């Protein structure tokens, strides 16, 4: 048994898909733990459909998941590493996946992961995925860290498993009930500050101002460059994550993929009372216009996410005045 699914009320088809995802995840955890012994998993091997560099492990993970899901209830397989949707058969499910999230961390032994999303399949491969994230029937991730864990929602809460290395199966832990609300942590890549829109800069300036600023408390910044790792920390400890669009070429809509990354993470976060937006609009209500569409992404504690939206709702002149008054990074 690759994963404990008893009592979750899953259909046999969905349970089979989850079992196969878990089995590949367990295999990848072992492969990652042996990086460099036989193969350099961080070796560059090309670029993916979005123009990002591919590592050997990206391709290996994609191949492993696709092969494991062939012949199952998954009719359509959409991967960040594939240009188009791959038709696997005549099943009833459509699975979107980022096979290896955070691949820049492979060679520095920092947590990486797999993100997946499952929809009911339609008659068309693309329309099976170009739909509201609220229509997902499952969304989750596998994190390959000091522990290998699997976190997933089927629309009725958030379930949590950890890989038992002795049995090579995922043992179920208590469900994740709610996000911690009083956490003074935020995650953003501050090196891009000069490129951000003024509402994001104003929001971050207020956090950096700490106890002497308008928020009246000190905050700590985190940045791991692995969406799975950031998500796992927020589920365990609370806080807020921001990856805004910015002024750089190719970054107007951020860099995270709507279908493969943001929709499933938003599905999880909202199940425990959190929020997930593009800075202004609800991610789960948005319709991606193409398979590899990108979106700005803000998620975490609902109150913090709502505060980011409030900064965007200010008239432009008010945001500019706020920024000029509180802009701590100004030279």
From Swiss-Prot:
Family: Belongs to the FBPase class 1 family.
Quaternary assembly: Homotetramer.
Cofactor(s), names only, from the UniProt record: Mg(2+)
Name of the featured protein: Fructose-1,6-bisphosphatase class 1
Keyword Secreted: no
Pfam families, A to Z: FBPase (PF00316), FBPase_C (PF18913)
Species in which this protein is naturally found: Rhodobacter capsulatus (strain ATCC BAA-309 / NBRC 16581 / SB1003)
Record field: catalytic activity: beta-D-fructose 1,6-bisphosphate + H2O = beta-D-fructose 6-phosphate + phosphate
